[in-house]
């Protein structure tokens, strides 16, 4: 079956045998602290995928609008990556717009139609972080409308709250994924100088606040704590000293995974194997843009980060961490307007006919080559998932 040019669930006998054989060999050989995982001890795993910034520039809003009906649809945006997202137990991305209602606007004060978040949900993104520098672009009404809209879509979210009581009831956000419970926390460096309107709350990067939130997550005995940090300098490919120091502090406090956003370009990823603590760690300083109208070099794409987590007693193991390069294709529609669609870059790289435009194809290749060179030097224990490697993470469900 071929969905959106991404092959899903190819049920060839040889592939099934290969997958089962690999799984049996892996489990039979995999031990933690001398204990065989095939034994009686509890062993639970989950597949989680993280995406970067969901931006909503004016051109994207125009592309989504049906001029005849006045309605909006973003389903095309996510169709090529939906099979990848849906093959995981949970998918999370950063919603860097408000859902404040009309008038719909892009930069600098973002407000997108609810259809944007709806399409992301339909593609498999069930969790959105909302603490970012555009969280208060439309004031108190924008914060409350965004929360209400996401609740109505049954999309889980974390980072902004109607008031202190709302925050107390929602922090941490606990997500069940594949038998594991994940505590998700989201914070931002600021809100573009716009004061947070009372009584609303936006999680800012405040160490006393973060430490208290992590402590609360620990008391809830969640299997893993994931901190989403909106930080760093825009368009810098390397993390700042502040990001590095804060990441070390977050790990020391008890965070297991750190996912960064805001730079709008890919930054390094580090998978840190446990050395005595019994818990693996991972930090992705920035996943880049999942979708936007930014077309400058390195901003026109990003990466999906796929992680297989397992818990064995009190130990957390990141069995596999890999990245999937994504690029924002902007084909010209029959209406004469640019459309927006996120494509798995490695797959489209092999099929020029799926792009059909030399200029865009070459731009995509430039993004791919830049990203592979960068990740080759700045991804610790992380591999690109493409071809057969990508198919192997798509379970036969």
Task: Kindly give the residue locations of the regions a language model identified.
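Bacterial N-terminal signal peptides that target proteins for export
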Residues: 5-18
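Acidic, metal/ion-coordinating pockets
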Residues: 30-397
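Short non-domain terminal segments
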Residues: 6-9, 28, 48
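Bacterial N-terminal signal peptides
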Residues: 16-28
């Amino acid at each position: 079956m071929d969905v959106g040019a991404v092959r899903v669930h190819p049920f060839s006998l040889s592939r099934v045998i290969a997958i089962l054989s690999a799984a049996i060999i892996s489990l039979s050989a995999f031990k933690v602290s001398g204990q065989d995982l095939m034994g009686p001890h509890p062993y639970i795993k989950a597949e989680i995928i993280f995406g970067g910034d969901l931006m909503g520039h004016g051109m994207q809003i125009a592309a989504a609008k049906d001029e005849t009906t006045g309605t909006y649809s973003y389903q095309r945006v996510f169709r090529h990556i939906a099979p990848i997202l849906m093959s995981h137990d949970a998918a999370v991305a950063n919603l860097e717009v408000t859902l404040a209602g009309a008038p719909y606007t892009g930069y600098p004060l973002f407000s997108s139609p609810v259809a944007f978040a709806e399409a992301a949900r339909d593609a498999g993104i069930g969790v959105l972080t909302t603490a970012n520098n555009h969280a208060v672009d439309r004031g108190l009404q924008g914060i409350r409308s965004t929360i209400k809209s996401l609740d109505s879509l049954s999309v889980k979210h974390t980072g902004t709250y109607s008031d202190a009581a709302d925050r107390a009831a929602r922090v941490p956000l606990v997500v069940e994924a594949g038998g594991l419970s994940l505590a998700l926390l989201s914070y931002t460096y600021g809100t573009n100088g716009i004061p947070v309107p009372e009584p609303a709350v936006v999680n800012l990067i405040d160490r006393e606040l973060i430490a208290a939130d992590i402590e609360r997550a620990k008391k809830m005995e969640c299997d893993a704590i994931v901190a989403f940090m909106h930080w760093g300098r825009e368009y810098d490919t390397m993390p700042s000293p502040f990001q590095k120091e804060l990441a070390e502090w977050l790990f020391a406090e008890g965070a297991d995974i750190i996912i960064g956003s805001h730079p709008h370009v890919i930054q390094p990823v580090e998978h840190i194997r446990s050395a005595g603590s019994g818990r693996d760690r991972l930090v992705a300083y920035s996943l880049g843009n999942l979708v936007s109208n930014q077309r400058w070099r390195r901003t026109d794409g990003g990466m999906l980060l796929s992680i297989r987590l397992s818990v064995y007693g009190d130990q957390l193991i990141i069995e596999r961490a890999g990245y999937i390069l994504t690029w924002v294709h902007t084909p010209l529609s029959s209406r004469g307007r640019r459309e927006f669609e996120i494509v798995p870059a490695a797959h489209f790289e092999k099929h020029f006919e799926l792009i059909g435009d030399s200029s865009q194809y070459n731009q995509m290749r430039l993004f791919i080559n830049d990203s592979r060179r960068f990740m080759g030097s700045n991804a610790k224990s992380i591999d690109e998932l493409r071809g057969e490697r990508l198919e192997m993470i798509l379970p036969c469900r």
